[in-house]
Amino acid sequence: MADAAAEIGFNGVDLTVRPNGHVLPERVEMDLPKAMEAIKNAGLATTMITTTVQDANDAIDRNVVETAAELDVKYYRMNWLKYPDGKSIPEAMMQFKKTLTDLSHLNRKLNITGCYQNHSGNLAGASIWELWEILKSADHKNMGVQYDIRHAVVEGGLSWRNGLNLIHPHIKILAVKDFIWSNKNGNWVVENVPFGEGMVDFKSYFKMLKEFNIQVPVSLHYEYPLGGADRGASTITIDKQIVFDYMKRDLLKLQQLWQEA
């Protein structure tokens, strides 16, 4: 994996440390150092990891964060939070505030930064305004946002710029991908597409990032059909070179649009 990422042109790998990921949470102390060593040997960095961490008092979650910090990982993406049945949204948001605040205090002790991804749908933080609210009491140096423009446009439509204006001081990592609305059997659904071929106005978005002077790590996501690679499958149904070609194509397109913005 590391050698392929280097050959494609990436300068780092966003490792998944979660069930069915590159590293299993319960094996983080044994396997994360090995994975990071392989990445380092390929000339790449491990600046960030993607996790299911969500509770500062959970032993496995704490161990993931502590191990990552010891290995000098700078950022981790935490798990998404779900609105519980039987509670009003304001009540649930009070609990979410405490969750992020507690994690931010753990992060501060360990000198690592946690990030919450805005994800479209019914998860907490789908709306940028929601996310801004639940971050209010956290230590903002050590807890922020993995801002995902694809999900922001799905939820924000034409008002995504307002959300970015609001949340940009809290952005720690960027996640980028693209989509279209597609009619499937009479129902309109979100369909992931190759970078730059969808509804995200990347030139306007990148221009705003430059205006805000946002210089943070970027994770390029591949979620359109790639023979199972898009879903993290251990075996895929298309030749791996086809996957690598799409990955390089998207990376070059990202770099091109950034330069043009």
What are these regions, as identified by a protein language model?
Residues 1-11, 128-143, 147, 153-261:
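Histidine-acidic metal/acid-base catalytic patches
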Residues 2-3, 19, 38, 53-145, ...:
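Active-site acidic/histidine proton-transfer and metal-coordination neighborhood
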Residues 17, 53, 80-83, 171, ...:
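Residues that line or immediately flank small-molecule/substrate-binding pockets and catalytic motifs
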Residues 12-14, 45-50, 74-77, 111-115, ...:
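Structural preference for beta-strand elements that scaffold enzyme active sites
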Residues 18-20, 56, 83, 121, ...:
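Residue-level marker for beta-strand->alpha-helix junctions and adjacent short loops that shape enzyme
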Residues 14-37, 87:
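Glycine-rich, proline-tolerant flexible connector loops at the mouths of alpha/beta enzymes
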Residues 38-45:
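Short, structured active-site "lid" loops
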Residues 19-24, 84-89, 155, 184, ...:
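A short acidic, helix-capping loop that chelates divalent metal ions and anchors anionic groups
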